[in-house]
Curated annotation (Swiss-Prot):
Belongs to the protein kinase superfamily. STE Ser/Thr protein kinase family. WNG subfamily. It comes from the Eukaryota. The gene is BPK1. The protein kinase domain is predicted to be catalytically inactive. It comes from Toxoplasma gondii. Disruption phenotype: In a mouse infection model, tachyzoite growth, conversion to bradyzoites and cyst formation are normal 4 weeks post-infection. However, cysts are smaller and their capacity to cause oral infection in a mouse host is reduced which is probably due to their increased susceptibility to the conditions in the host digestive system. This is Bradyzoite pseudokinase 1. SUPFAM superfamilies: Protein kinase-like (PK-like) (SSF56112).
Amino acid sequence: MANTSVRRRQLLSSVLLLQWLTTVLGVAWGPNPIDGSKHGQFPSLRRTEGVSQSGSGHKGSVYRIPLADMTFWSWMSYLKELPDIDESRNPILKRLLSGSFLRRDGSTTVNVRVPARELVRLLSLTPEQQREGVSAKVRLINLLDPKYSVYEPYLYREILPKRSPLLLPSLGEYRGAFLTYIFHPLSKGLVGDMLETGRSHPDVQVLAANMVAALKSLHNLGLLHRSIELNSFSVLPDGTVVLGGLDTAAPIGTETRLWVGFFGQETAPEIDRNFLADLALTQGRHTVKSDVYSLGVAFRNLVQLLGNGNIGPEDRGAVRQDHLELLDKLSQKMIEEEPGNRPTIEEIMKDPLFEGLNFEDIEEGKARPFRYKQNRL
């Protein structure tokens, strides 16, 4: 047993060393968009003034290199162009500089219930947003792998529309001393967590439709999510359910790295699941149908949570048994092992579960799946 453990540690060390050497060689030999001398296959990067895709209203940069063609130097250049934030002027953010709050992967999320005056000014928060608070999604700046630090800010500033009703909005993206930040409205909680506490009042039909419409809106932008689960969805202060966790998103039809590391049970069976594939963090088989599979697993978990009494007795009337049964049948179709046998998003929207719903209203963010106002978790 001890020898096996030692061999596995040696294998892990070897793989990580190989990844590090690959990164270093990429730095040494990769094209540098700043000087343009080695850019035969790519157009030059030129910063043009434009409104940021985030809600902060600050100026963003528009890159001509497609996301799938971004190189090490492209990400490094983009990291340098992120607007600065002075953590020392924000007491809660200042505590992050010690590094003790970061997880092992160099990330964390911090809730700022009472934003400091400097943060209010920086994010141009309205009085209502000040009262509701904000959250900060934080990542350590990794100079050996700048994409890790700046990938999600890039999506919000360059790809996602300024207003997308069913995607978690950004209030601004910044670079600090050694951390990058994305600020979001402070939500009431994550859908999975809210259901597990038994303090929620969900309309199952509307909630499931909202989740389908949110995924459709992401696919319409040409992006896969690749890591959907119940807690990928947040409930905003106004009751809207939005899709977040976009750091795992990638263009449809491309082979790109997925930075979340090991996969859970939500991953479609056609995705590589062997030990070395997980270590390499390289997944090349994600498709629209693999997102459908993950959403189907989320639906199955939703049925289990609500069907096992994880809601208060006063909520029982808000959860219709026939909707749970229809959702269970739909989830079984979505988690078929063969991708070709899974329904498309359009076919899912026509399922009997959603009979009588107006998906146009749902796609515009008018639905409120949780019927009663809840306190934050």
